[in-house]
């Protein structure tokens, strides 16, 4: 499934714009299966890594198993993502805005919503912490009559109509997912 997005800037743009409900993205890079190594512990392999013209960085994870989308995995991905994106001497305020997006087969957060946007908040005031790190979960079982519902329908159609590789990833073509006709 993720190979659909490798180098396909328009397809990646369409996916991100649908999930983030934006229409102003300019994706300048899309790579699949990017490994972020960690000398001191666990490394991660990003299903889809992308960045846009504003310098925002995206990690999109396509998960068929609920166990692959636990909150602790989002925490690990965001920490290694940040470590990879920073340089020695860089001001903290210059860190790029990051998005970790999990597209899951099921409603792993069990709230019946199509999308869950997780932002850190100051508990005593309820104000946003504004650390420029965002986590988004997309409920793959959602079938509403809207852009997210249609996108998840297409993801599900790919899953059912194609073989599954040994890694548990769905195999599909860009016409299945990234076609204005199907969205």
Regions found by a protein language model. Give the residues of each.
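Elongated, amphipathic alpha-helical interaction scaffolds
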Residues: 1-183
């Amino acid at each position: 499934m993720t190979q659909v997005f490798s180098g396909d800037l328009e397809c990646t743009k369409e996916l991100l714009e649908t999930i983030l409900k934006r229409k102003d993205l300019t994706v300048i890079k899309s790579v699949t299966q990017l490994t972020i190594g960690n000398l001191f512990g666990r490394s991660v392999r990003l299903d889809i890594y992308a960045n846009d013209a504003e310098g925002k960085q995206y990690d999109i994870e396509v998960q068929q198993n609920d166990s692959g989308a636990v909150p602790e995995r989002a925490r690990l991905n965001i920490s290694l993502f940040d470590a990879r994106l920073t340089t020695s001497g860089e001001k903290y305020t210059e860190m790029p805005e990051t998005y970790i997006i999990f597209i899951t087969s099921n409603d792993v957060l069990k709230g019946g919503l199509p999308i869950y946007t997780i932002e850190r908040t100051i508990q005593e005031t309820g104000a946003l912490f504004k650390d420029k790190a965002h986590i988004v979960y997309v409920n793959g079982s959602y079938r509403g009559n809207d852009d997210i519902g249609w996108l998840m329908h297409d993801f599900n159609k790919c899953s059912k109509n194609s073989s599954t590789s040994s890694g548990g990833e769905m195999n599909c073509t860009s016409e299945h997912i990234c076609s204005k006709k199907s969205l």
